[in-house]
Amino acid sequence: MLTQTDNELICRTGPGTPMGEYLRRFWIPALCSDEISEPDSPPVRVKILNEELVAYRDTNGDVGLLDNYCPHRRASLFFGRNEECGLRCVYHGWKFDTKGDCVDMPSEPAESNFKDKVKIKAYPARDWGGYIWAYMGPAEFQPDLPEVGWAMVPDSHRKVSRRLQENNFVQGIEGGIDSSHISFLHFGLPPVLRDDPNYTGRTLTNTDSAPHFLVKNTDYGFVYGANREAENNSYYWRLTPFMLPFFTVIPGGSGDPDQRTYSGHGWVPADDESCWMFTYSWNASRPLNHGEGHDASFLKKEPRTLRAILNKDNDYGIDREVQRTQTFTGIDSISVQDSGIQESMGAICDRTKEHLGTSDSAVIAMRRIYLQACRDLLEGKEPFVPRKGSAYRVRSVADVMDRSVTFEENTKRVAVGVA
């Protein structure tokens, strides 16, 4: 459990909050690149870290991420005209470039220099690995982009998506680093996944529902291991890297680690009661096939809000007969099972009422890292992890191995290039 004070500390992410300032030290995904795929295409609303922004790609292909509200009379720039290397407010014609400079002010006299005195809030934005990334922190601490696996492969080798999840981002992360729940929440598979080679470990996760858990801190966050009993004096190991501030790589697949398809999620706060679940799948050795990738990439979403069609308003499509006869939940899709349960805890979970057990080792480790990071910032200590971009070249592990192979030996296999 957490105290109410600590719970508030890690869950509140607006400007000026300790957690919000910590997250702003990192490059974070704001939207998918294909949402603004063409120069001069329509701008897109973006809400991250409790800030309402608008993203656009200008005539030259450069990306702008601006305050949604024009500094003149606060009209929304979502309705603006994206033309001739700038976003123009349709209320009075003020126009802003990707750096936030006002480059045209047709409502003022031609001889006026007023436009030279007006700027709009603009954040550095980069097109990287299928996402538009934003840096929202102090300029003097801007790091290099993280070398995440899906960004290090050609476009055809990856798939990315995002959708809205209606709970605080911490709940999403806690689900992503909890290996124990797969033996229950995801017990039984929808037919489309029953023969999927990425789920060959399913039998082992179902037959041993109380695995042994270990955590090791790393330069990028930590790696979390769970081993389950397997045949022939072996363990089934699942190792999940947690990359600060909110990324995971899900254990799965089989065969040569360099040939596998990997998937993961990142949970980016929209505000304190909702988050964006970014999903990525990639294969370093070949292009992804049609239909390949995490099931979250294929969920039906409301086109304007990016909210899943199966949501709390329709109880996530739960089918009690399927629950009775086929799956543990009666809810279709692993991703909807996850988001449904995470949203059921409330917008911000009351962690003062929890009772954590040994299976919650990774959750406890993540909270400790967050709390310490917030306290360090309050004391003026800057985080070092954002400057460790090359440390993010990691992947998950899901393999049956001899009992003699230790957790420490297994953690070395998380680094890309180690068999």
Region locations from a protein language model:
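Alpha-helical interaction segments
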Residues: 16-17, 81, 86, 306
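A generic structural signal for short, non-catalytic loop/turn and secondary-structure boundary residues
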Residues: 21-23, 48, 118, 127, ...
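Generic N-terminal leader segments that precede the first folded domain
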Residues: 28-30
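C-terminal catalytic domain of Rieske-type non-heme iron oxygenases
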Residues: 15, 37-38, 62, 139-419
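Rieske [2Fe-2S] iron-sulfur-binding domain
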Residues: 1, 11, 32-159, 212, ...
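Short, flexible, glycine/charge-rich loop motifs used to bind or transfer phosphoryl groups or to couple energy/partner
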Residues: 18, 77, 162
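A boundary/linker detector
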Residues: 1-24
